[in-house]
């Protein structure tokens, strides 16, 4: 209703009856806080933005690491971070930025009040250099220290302790109904490793379930095809790349899918691969959550719970700021919010939609774009500025 008022003269509401409901239950966004610390205030604003655009799922990727080749091919020097305060493992949280338990709980409470569910993600057994920096003996000597050693019982003890810290108690740190356990991009070079990976995945699905949570995983079980059973009932799988998890096979095995196809909805700022800015026109005119790569399902297929898009901060320290991230994410969020709500039945031409979305604010009380009104105007001017001099104008 506020968006209607924003687009009308004198903020008036037209007279009539509205009847509106979504085609897809889960409509979300994933943000990589592991490779780049995202300030709490930014996440708070994004909860408000998502609520304003009727998106209801924010996945927070809490750990990750850079690429070894950019750090002298030395794992010990490669950037890695885990972003949540830990009492079980003092010093595990990244020195350059982390969230206290109380901050993370309060963020989730804010989200709950706005009907946004936060899904925390601890990614393992790959992307785990932050954990092996802390406890080197659980790192894989064969596949790299960003992989956990799945043959070492200490690996399970460490990860059990980490998940337990945030899942147990009367007021757990992870408040929501769902917890994401990662499970993407682990090596499949040897059959015994694949079977260990499948066992690890099954263990942590059941482990988070033992605390009353619904487990979410990244799709990997086509890449890691094997004999060890992995629980599928009531498990949500992020379908990101069909070579890692064939969506038709995963549905047949019993998984419910979130559509997050990397070739269409991954933003990797200033990387030179994937999208820097999503092709919002193409997505608006062509995509719905039932299109996962080249696999296309009937609209509103009950096995596909909804869709998400993601920003991955792959290149550590590349100068990209949170303002830069917002500049990329915000138009994508506006566009995909419509597609995840309406599916194929959008009726407004893209040019009109694009004009309308630019006329709407980010959310009440949010101004990450630094807008000054809706009509461009002169703020101040100065004919020239001498080198090393200061202007009397404050930065805006």
Q: What residues fall within each predicted segment?
A:
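Flexible, acidic glycine-rich loops studded with aromatic residues
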Residues: 227-235, 242-393
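Soluble non-cytosolic domains of exported or imported proteins
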Residues: 37-41, 98-102, 153, 157, ...
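Feature activates predominantly on carbohydrate-active enzymes
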Residues: 1-147, 154, 160-178, 308, ...
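Generic beta-strand/beta-sheet core signal
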Residues: 61-63, 119-125, 182-184, 216-220, ...
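Non-transmembrane alpha-helical segments in soluble domains
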Residues: 47, 108, 205, 334-337
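Short secondary-structure boundary/capping segments
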Residues: 76, 134-138, 196-199, 273-276, ...
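Flexible loop/turn segments at secondary-structure boundaries
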Residues: 37-39, 65-69, 125-131, 186-190, ...
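Active-site neighborhood of glycoside hydrolase catalytic domains
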Residues: 131-236, 240-256
